[in-house]
Amino acid sequence: MKKFTKVVSLMLAAILMMALCTACGSDSKKDDSTITFGTNAEFPPFEYVTAKGVIGEFDGIDMAIAKQIGEDNGMEAKIENMEFDSLLLALENGQVDAVIAGMTITDEKKDAVDFSEPYYTAKQVMIVKEDSDIQKASDMADKKIVVLQGFTGETCVNEMGYKYESFKKGTEAIMELVNGKCDVVVIDSATAEKYVEDNEGLKIVEDNDAFEAEEYGIAVKKGNTELLDKINKSLDKMMEDGTISELSAKYAESSDAE
């Protein structure tokens, strides 16, 4: 889902340098009774704000997974909501213990942080109006394209060499399409399904040759093997007992994101 662009690549480099500079330092004692996850609650059905969520006002697939990770390890899961591009910096600074935000695992990000095993596989798709003539990615060449800032869709469209406009919120991007201000929105498949369900007159167009599958993982600070082991054990359990599949089906069917 979410992959960093050139500006954030510089931030990743800065995070890596910070990690190297502090590698020999000692961390202050942390509260073992809580685990704080950073997220960007603008990505239904994975994370969004609602009247009553599984963790305070936060709900979605990722939020339910975060809560279960906390419970499996005898900790209370807490959420810090922030801009997506700030998440890994918050992780490096110790503001959060882990990041769960539908984050795509990439080699570039693995240089700066450690990732859990993948817990979800997604791909990029195109949302268009039902009468659109866009049938494949190359048909976007002369169209007005909208993407989400910092997300994988932005990287893909940029690599294709197409011009685009980026928005921070998925709802804003979709309203551009609904109101006829753009021709196509490039976004993650799971989120696309939810937006199409909630907005009449839209459809999803797939192009498996243009968009490769991507895997989501939970990020922790480089070298934090103790926490990473706890997260992976919990994820293993949830994948084996079908919890993650059940959550995916539940939240794909319905979410009351505000």
For the regions a protein language model found, what residue spans apply to each?
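A ligand-binding cleft/hinge motif common to bilobed small-molecule-binding domains
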Residues: 86, 103-111, 156, 183-213
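Ligand-binding clefts/hinges and TM-proximal coupling segments of bilobed small-molecule sensing domains
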Residues: 26-28, 76-78, 152-168, 203-210, ...
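Periplasmic-binding protein-like
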Residues: 41, 121-128, 193-236, 252-258
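Alpha-to-beta junction loops
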Residues: 74-76, 92-101, 144, 178-191, ...
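Extracytoplasmic small-molecule ligand-binding "clamshell" domains
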Residues: 29-102
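C-terminal motif of bacterial Sec signal peptides marking the signal peptidase cleavage site
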Residues: 19-23
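Flexible hinge/capping segments at coil-to-helix
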Residues: 128-145
